[in-house]
Curated annotation (Swiss-Prot):
This is 2,3,4,5-tetrahydropyridine-2,6-dicarboxylate N-succinyltransferase. Keywords: Acyltransferase, Amino-acid biosynthesis, Cytoplasm, Diaminopimelate biosynthesis, Lysine biosynthesis, Repeat, Transferase. It comes from the Bacteria. One of its GO terms (biological process) is lysine biosynthetic process via diaminopimelate. HAMAP family: DapD. The gene is dapD. It is an enzyme of class 2 (transferase). Its EC number is 2.3.1.117. It holds the Pfam family Hexapep_2. Pathway: Amino-acid biosynthesis; L-lysine biosynthesis via DAP pathway; LL-2,6-diaminopimelate from (S)-tetrahydrodipicolinate (succinylase route): step 1/3. Belongs to the transferase hexapeptide repeat family.
Length: 285
């Protein structure tokens, strides 16, 4: 699809979104065709909700988010078949694997373990491995990435290549509550078990999050070496663990107030060290 075609597609979707109250399951013609085309492009990985430039900045294609949202107005609730014992579900979004055969799986080149769920319009790159996990619509999962058991990749989230999302990890979506930008995990990151990254935060390339680290837009990310406090973004090649900071105030009874949660950068490593060092060694203080 040419840039001209994409521009025309985005304009149709932008206009439809401005008039979304008029969009419903009975809508036909250009609007439905444009939304279907956008979802197919997302599903195939030909377009992404967010793209990284050479300087590291991320650009969000808001029109693709809007296409995903419009699809909820266009599509009726339907039975989704395929559960154990002929069980069914009731939803507006089809499985990515609906109608797939051996040919489609071989062409896609990733591994989908039984009981993983991937919704249509999510892209899974070759050599990725999906354990029993959930990947929501509009998401992008890069080449060689492992989505481990019970991990969740939220709507429109962007996961880079060679990432490990450990068991029970949650990567937040953008659709509800509505976020300006998707949550992004860049290439070669390791996210420890039961950690959560949400609200459009970015974990930069090569970073390691220890088990149980929670990062949202209001979470203080503290560099232990410098004392710098930052929000919303973990710098490249950071090793991060859960911690706490003094609140700096007293309670009504005069006693010191409880410490408050923060994420602590305990060290930073270069690309060479990160590639040669085991995760457990990096997390040792």
């Amino acid at each position: 699809m040419t840039n001209h075609d994409l521009a025309s597609l985005s304009q149709t979707i932008e206009t439809a979104f401005e008039n979304r109250d008029a969009v419903n399951t009975g809508t036909r013609g250009a609007v439905r065709d444009a939304v279907e085309a956008a979802l197919n492009l997302l599903d195939s990985g030909k377009v992404r909700v967010a793209e990284r430039a050479a300087d590291g900045t991320w650009t969000v294609n808001q029109w693709l988010k809007k296409a995903v949202l419009l699809s909820f107005r266009l599509n009726p609730m339907e039975l989704v078949r395929g559960g154990p014992g002929e069980a069914v579900w009731w939803d507006k979004v089809a499985s990515k694997f609906d109608g797939w055969s051996v040919n489609e799986f071989e062409k896609a080149g990733f591994r989908a373990v039984p009981n993983c769920v991937v919704r249509r319009s999510a892209y899974i790159a070759p050599n990725a491995v999906l354990m029993p996990s959930f990947v929501n619509l509009g998401a992008y999962v890069g080449e060689g990435t492992m989505v481990d058991t019970w991990a969740t990749v939220g709507s429109c989230a962007q996961i880079g290549k060679n990432v490990h999302l450990s068991g029970g990890v949650g990567i937040g979506g953008v659709l509800e509550p509505m976020q300006a930008g998707p949550t992004i995990i860049e290439d070669n990151c390791f996210i420890g078990a039961r950690s959560e990254v949400v609200e459009g935060c970015i974990v930069r390339e090569g970073s390691v999050l220890g088990m149980g680290v929670f990062i949202g837009k209001s979470t203080k990310i503290v560099d232990r070496a410098t004392g710098e406090v930052m929000y919303g973004e973990v710098p490249p090649y950071s090793v991060v663990v859960a911690g706490s900071m003094p609140s700096g105030s007293a309670m009504g009874n005069g006693q010191p107030a409880p410490n408050l949660y923060c994420a602590v950068i305990v060290k930073r490593v270069d690309e060479k060290t990160r590639s040669k060092t085991g995760i457990n060694e990096l997390l040792r203080d």
